[in-house]
Regions:
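Extended acidic/charged loop-beta regions that coordinate divalent cations
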Residues: 2-46
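Nucleotide phosphate-binding/pyrophosphate-handling subdomain across enzymes
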Residues: 39-120
Length: 120
């Protein structure tokens, strides 16, 4: 998938922004939320908290944060750092490792990578 995106970006003279596992580090997984740090060209070991115990959502959140900074840099949106941190902490992913009762979780894993992350 990455190859296809990079090829299309090159053909259209567009930048590609991504996040790899080396860009973030899980500080603590409490089971119901995760503290992590993000270190890339936009964030310098900034700490965030997401309200899910789904480890794979750390990379998704990191990518969303990076995309927001790209949009900020290009003048598409205005963002304040403290507002971004607060917003991330309030995000809820209904149907993504959502606990609906004691020991009962719902997850709508919708692709092979999501299913792999769910069962591993």
């Amino acid at each position: 998938m990455t190859d296809i995106i990079e090829k299309n970006a090159e053909e259209n003279n567009c930048e590609v922004y991504g996040v790899t596992q080396k860009d973030f580090q899980i500080i603590k997984n409490y089971g119901y939320c995760i503290d992590f740090s993000l270190n890339n060209m936009y964030y310098k070991n900034d700490c965030f908290t997401i309200t899910t115990g789904a480890v794979y959502q750390v990379q998704n959140c990191s990518l969303a944060l990076t995309a927001a900074e790209v949009l900020k840099k290009t003048g598409v949106v205005k963002l304040e750092s403290n507002a971004v941190h607060k917003a991330v902490k309030k995000v809820q992913w209904h149907g993504r490792m959502e606990q609906i009762a004691d020991n009962i979780y719902v997850d709508g894993a919708h692709n092979p990578e999501g299913i792999e992350a769910l069962i591993c």
